[in-house]
């Protein structure tokens, strides 16, 4: 399963670890992904999404119906 937020599209970023001596080694910054079930009243069913904490805040703000409509418009399978 890919580490991509279904709502925001955030994916892992690449950067460096820096030691005290300023040596650089590659590392990945992973998004804060959570699996969460949301009740969709209009469809009378739960929708299971893999999303970041920011994605959950967006759903709290806009509502699950609006976010699902945006995702379906993008071609996301929900």
Curated annotation (Swiss-Prot):
Task: Write one Pfam family the protein is assigned to.
Answer: Ribosomal_L28
Region Disordered, residue ranges: 1-25
A single Gene Ontology MF term assigned here is: structural constituent of ribosome
Q: Hydrolase as a keyword?
A: no
Write down the superkingdom of origin. Answer: Bacteria
SUPFAM superfamilies xref list: L28p-like
Q: Which GO terms describe its cellular component?
A: cytosolic large ribosomal subunit
* This protein's record includes keyword Ribosomal protein: yes
| Keyword entries, A-Z | Ribonucleoprotein, Ribosomal protein
Alphabetical GO biological process terms:
translation
Q: Which family does it belong to?
A: Belongs to the bacterial ribosomal protein bL28 family.
Q: Which PANTHER family match?
A: 39S RIBOSOMAL PROTEIN L28, MITOCHONDRIAL (PTHR13528), LARGE RIBOSOMAL SUBUNIT PROTEIN BL28M (PTHR13528:SF2)
Protein name as it appears in the record: Large ribosomal subunit protein bL28
